[in-house]
Design a protein with these regions (language model features):
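Catalytic/RNA-binding core of pseudouridine synthases
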Residues: 1-295
Length: 295
């Protein structure tokens, strides 16, 4: 079954759900996908009274991203790979004129670039060149595996050993085949004008996680977030529809290069995963509450 805000209370037996349970959750800002699974799994085990209950997700989201994360319980975990293969839609905030090693706000700016020539029209005209199947170089700091080890773990290890980020990138570079089907500029902010940078819901789609909510995440205290909004750099909010495995951070990097500048992601929301939209997703609190109803 698919759990949504209007679903009837769950029974106490997981056997009543032979195909398992899928919960579309709006992942909070600064939570890892593992944080969400940990919270839901604890509630599900208590609710169904089954210690070996399987709980997983279909498609990870970066800590600084919000939006649809599909949580699978019981037999639904067998559907995770299929659910993950469906196309996705994102709403991304892209800041031009500067880059970061992680291509988002987890790392501080490492280089500045000219940006006076960038306009709303120029951004819109550049987007069609990204439509279609293409090879994409994954970010150095990513969840992609290299010989069975997460790339970000290897990147941090190599960096700690004294290698520069460029040297680490040469060892860990990975290219994937992706497909971008739609791109649209939703907003554009000229240099020096106020913007909604660091807003995990750049177009008002879904609530912004409060600091109190973010503090519940075990990872939030160790996830760095830089604030570059005071720099007054140009910024665009872009809607993207794409295939599994597309890194929106890498798209931001490539868009900046195409425009003769640099760029990084300042906000990201997965607004859709397959048929599941963020408007119909549950908060973590709603999911936990649904798993605590008395029967």
């Amino acid at each position: 079954m698919i759990l949504n805000p209007d679903s009837a209370p769950l029974t106490r037996s997981i056997d009543d759900y032979p195909e398992g349970i899928i919960i579309p959750i709006d992942k909070p800002y600064r939570w890892t996908s593992a944080d969400v699974i940990r919270k839901v799994k604890f509630a599900a085990i208590r609710h169904f009274g089954k210690k070996n209950l399987k709980v997983g997700h279909a498609g990870t989201l970066d800590p600084l991203a919000t939006g649809v994360l599909l949580v699978c319980i019981g037999k639904a975990t067998k559907l995770a790979e299929e659910l993950q293969s469906h196309d996705k839609e994102y709403v991304a905030g892209v800041t031009f004129g500067a880059t970061t090693p992680s291509y988002d706000l987890e790392k501080e700016i490492d280089r500045f670039f000219p940006y006076d020539h960038i306009t709303a029209e120029g951004v819109a005209e550049a987007l069609p060149g990204f439509i279609g199947e293409q090879d994409q170089v994954a970010p150095l700091f990513s969840a992609k595996s290299v010989d069975g080890v997460r790339a970000y773990e290897l990147a941090r290890k190599l960096h700690a050993e004294g290698k520069t980020l460029d040297e680490a990138a040469q060892e860990l570079i990975r290219v994937s085949k992706i497909n971008i089907t739609e791109l649209e500029v939703l907003e554009y902010h000229s240099p020096g004008k106020a913007s909604s940078q660091n807003n995990p819901s750049p177009c008002g789609q879904g609530d912004i996680t409060t600091p109190a909510e973010a503090a519940e995440s075990k990872a939030s205290s160790r996830i760095n977030v830089t604030d570059n909004s005071a720099l007054g750099l140009p910024r665009a909010v872009i809607r993207m529809s794409c295939s599994k495995g597309t890194y929106v951070r890498a798209f931001a990097r490539d868009l900046g290069e195409k425009l003769g500048s640099g760029a990084h992601l300042d906000s990201l929301q997965r607004s859709r995963s397959g048929i599941f939209r963020v408007e119909n997703a549950l908060t973590v609190e709603q999911a936990v509450k649904a798993l605590s109803h008395e029967q």
